[in-house]
Amino acid sequence: MHWIWLVLLLAVVGAIVGAATNALAIRMLFRPHRAYSIGKWQLPFTPGLLPRRQKELAVQLGNIVANHLLTAEGLGKKFGSTAFAAELTNWLKKQLASWLRSERTVESILKPLFQADIGREHLVVQSKSWLKDRLKRYLQKNKEVPIKSVVPQELQDRLTDWLPEASALLLKRATAYIDSEEGEQRIGAMVRQFLTTKGKVGSMVSMFFSADKLTEYVLPEIKKFLHDEQTKETVQSLLQTEWHRMLNRPLASFQAENYVDQFVDKAAEELEGKIPVLNWYNAPLSTWTTPYAEPLVERGVPVIVGMVTVYMEQHIADILSKLRLEEVIEEQVASFSMAHLEKLIMNITRRELHMITLLGGLIGGIVGLIQAVIVHFFY
């Protein structure tokens, strides 16, 4: 009977010692978090293993993740897999379809992103201000530049080719005016003014011809002059001369900067209600995206996903090298408090560490039994 109690006692003591030893060893992996000293003598095993080697642990974890887990080859295969592309496509389709059906306006979406007033009126004012400033800067910078350097060559050629037509149109309009009642009255008034302002010469002419009679003689001659081919050539030559002279004038000679504000304000007034983007700006997305929703979702998303996955597959190595994952992980792990790092490791390995403690107790119990047998038979 005494022998049985001895066996049980030694087995229990061995189990307790074995379990306690393993539990203490596990505890010493994490604790203490800092070094303790008596005077100048630092106590051994302080700090614990992981606190002492936290920096080295961070470096090794970074290398393991970057070189063996998140590798370019592995991620490239993932991006290149059909299953991943299909999953990403379906997810993006759902997200885009939901977004296009949204009752939110473009303004409400953009405002939080830019953290500024981007209402329609504000955008119009800012656009006008920006355009005025740009035009004035351009005119100031190029004030000595001839017009021909500013006007596109194609437009210059078209206007030059149009000059014969313009001269013909000018003469045609002049002829039509002369043939009109207003034109005849105007010519008659000019004749009367001539007679009254030329003193003796006018009085002498008036003795032979009345103003109306003289007008009847002058009108056919004017019409004949307007229909003459030489007149057409002269007008065309004058227009071409003035056109080329204008092309060589400096931009500043037109004083265009004085009309910039008026021009921009008028253009903005005319265009504001005709630009679809501005009309869509304060309208819910669903009211104007409906015609485009199906093509975007069904055809646009697969194309975009295909382009993105191919690009990522081809350039993932460069992207990872720029990210420097090992440095990111190293810095992150090194910045953890030891308590947080201990919690992370314990959450992952708690069951296994508990089994190690129990294994220590089991081995200690077996050693205790062996000791009991040795004591009983040899002592």
Curated annotation (Swiss-Prot):
One of its GO terms (cellular component) is plasma membrane. InterPro entries: DUF445, UCP032178. The chain crosses the membrane at residues 1-21, 358-378. It is found in: Cell membrane. Keywords: Cell membrane, Membrane, Transmembrane, Transmembrane helix. It is a multi-pass membrane protein. Coiled coil: none annotated. PANTHER family: UPF0754 MEMBRANE PROTEIN YHEB. Belongs to the UPF0754 family. This is UPF0754 membrane protein ABC1518.
